[in-house]
Every structure is written in C-alpha cells, then in structure tokens.
C-alpha cells in the first residue's frame, strides 16, 4: 500500500533541503523494506535546483543561489503555486527508468485532461506540454526529474498550477531555449491551486501504478 503525505500543502511552503533530507530517509527505508512506498505532495519555498546535466550558461546570471541535486535533467524552479510530487516507489524488475518517467507523464496528462487541458508529450523532451499553435511556442506545464537507486525512485515532478512564471526568466528552464513554460491557471483562464489539483494527482498515480493509497501516520509527516 502506498502512503501519501499532503502535509506540505497546508499553506506553509516546505524548504527544499528539508524535503530532500526527508526523501533520502524515506528512500533508505523503502529500499530496506522498513517503510511503505510513499508519495510526498507539497509546495516549496522559492528555490532553483539543478540536475546533473546543468551547464553554467543555464544558471541565473545574477548569482542567485542554486541547489545542485542528484537527479536527472537540468535547472528548474520550485515555489508557491506549484505542486511538487516526490514518489518514493520500488520499481518492479526489470527496472525500466524511461518507462517510469513515461508513466508519470501519463498520470499528469490524465490530470490535465480532467481539468480540460490537452497536455501532450513532445518527442525528445521529458515532461508534459502544451503544444505550440503558431502563435506561441511549446510550453511546459510539468517538469520531471528523477533518480533511481537500489530500484527505488527519488525526486519526481513539478506541476505548474497557479505559480508566477517570473522566476523562469532568469534561467534556461530545463536547458530548453526554444520553448516556454505555462501554468494550468494560465491555460484555463481561472485559478487552479496545488490544493485543487492534489486529489486528482493522487488518484491518477494510484491508477497508473496500481497502488492502493493510505494517509501517512501523523508522526512521520513532512516537517515544514
């Protein structure tokens, strides 16, 4: 049974380093079988994080601090209004990392469809996108960057719900120069918050990964 933890959506954004330490602890416990698979859903305090393939020219030019992390992908931003999900799951053998990413994308495409948005994959690019229409370029709605060790996943996805896009102007988001970013709110013309999207995300991940979900015990919830 997969546990889910939405305590990071209580209105107090979670510091990135705090969440990272929790992920690492849970990863170790899931890997050894001492904790059930867990999905963390939260909002972060504003932060830039850089995956292993980030180059210097993609970072902020004004010296804004960036947290370097051990996930795939490049630089991105997290902050209030964005729903971040960290599934800590044991992948079935044989481990298929690309297949896992595609399943995360499928779950998020399902959520967007429920909201009335036709999110898509774009060949050669991870994440979920609004395709360009001749008046605007392809725009990313959800970024994905993961790590798998000992057959157990870490890191995850970031779904732009109602966040400002201003912070993206200071970086080359995900290392992609010929595309943009958007939010669910911008696409629909009405406000959709992380708290609004969270139940749909939980249901979509349950359906995609075939896990029954249960709330985490209070004593092990995320510390903000």
UniProtKB/Swiss-Prot annotation:
Q: Name one Pfam family in it.
A: LplA-B_cat
Keyword Acyltransferase found: yes
Q: Where is this region: Disordered?
A: 51-71
- Which GO annotations describe the biological process of this protein? protein modification process
- Tell me where in this chain the BPL/LPL catalytic domain is found: 33-213
Q: What class of enzyme is it?
A: transferase
**Residues annotated as binding substrate:** 71-78, 143-145, 156-158
Q: Where in the cell is it found?
A: Cytoplasm
Query: What Enzyme Commission number(s) does the record list for this chain?
Result: 2.3.1.181
- List the catalytic activities from the record: octanoyl-[ACP] + L-lysyl-[protein] = N(6)-octanoyl-L-lysyl-[protein] + holo-[ACP] + H(+)
Keyword terms, alphabetized: Acyltransferase, Cytoplasm, Transferase
Q: Which InterPro entries match?
A: aa-tRNA-synth_II/BPL/LPL, BPL_LPL_catalytic, Octanoyltransferase, Octanoyltransferase_CS
User: Which GO MF terms are attached to this record?
Assistant: lipoyl(octanoyl) transferase activity
Q: Where is this site: Lowers pKa of active site Cys?
A: 140
GO annotations of cellular component type: cytoplasm
| Pathway(s) the chain acts in | Protein modification; protein lipoylation via endogenous pathway; protein N(6)-(lipoyl)lysine from octanoyl-[acyl-carrier-protein]: step 1/2
> What does the function comment of this entry state?
Catalyzes the transfer of endogenously produced octanoic acid from octanoyl-acyl-carrier-protein onto the lipoyl domains of lipoate-dependent enzymes. Lipoyl-ACP can also act as a substrate although octanoyl-ACP is likely to be the physiological substrate.
Q: Which PANTHER family match?
A: LIPOYLTRANSFERASE 2, MITOCHONDRIAL-RELATED, OCTANOYLTRANSFERASE
- Reproduce the miscellaneous comment text: In the reaction, the free carboxyl group of octanoic acid is attached via an amide linkage to the epsilon-amino group of a specific lysine residue of lipoyl domains of lipoate-dependent enzymes.
Q: What is this protein called?
A: Octanoyltransferase
Source organism: Leifsonia xyli subsp. xyli (strain CTCB07)
């Amino acid at each position: 049974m997969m546990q889910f933890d939405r305590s990071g959506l209580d209105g107090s954004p979670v510091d990135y380093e705090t969440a990272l330490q929790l992920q690492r602890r849970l990863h170790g416990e899931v890997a050894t079988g001492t904790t059930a698979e867990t999905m963390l859903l939260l909002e972060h305090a504003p932060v830039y994080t850089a995956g292993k393939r980030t180059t210097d020219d993609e970072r902020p030019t004004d010296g804004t601090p960036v947290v370097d992390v051990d996930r795939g992908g490049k630089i991105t931003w997290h902050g209030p209004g964005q729903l971040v999900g960290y599934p800590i799951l044991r992948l079935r053998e044989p481990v298929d990392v690309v297949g896992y990413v595609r399943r995360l994308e499928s779950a998020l495409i399902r959520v967007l469809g429920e909201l009335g948005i036709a999110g898509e994959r774009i060949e050669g690019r991870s994440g979920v996108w609004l395709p360009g229409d001749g008046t605007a370029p392809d725009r990313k709605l959800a970024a994905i960057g993961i790590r798998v060790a000992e057959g157990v996943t870490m890191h995850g996805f970031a779904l732009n719900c109602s966040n400002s896009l201003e912070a993206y102007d200071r970086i080359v988001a995900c290392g992609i120069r010929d595309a943009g970013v958007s939010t669910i709110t911008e696409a629909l013309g009405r406000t959709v918050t992380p708290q609004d999207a969270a139940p749909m995300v939980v249901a979509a991940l349950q359906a995609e990964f075939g896990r029954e979900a249960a709330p985490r015990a209070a004593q092990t919830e995320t510390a903000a």
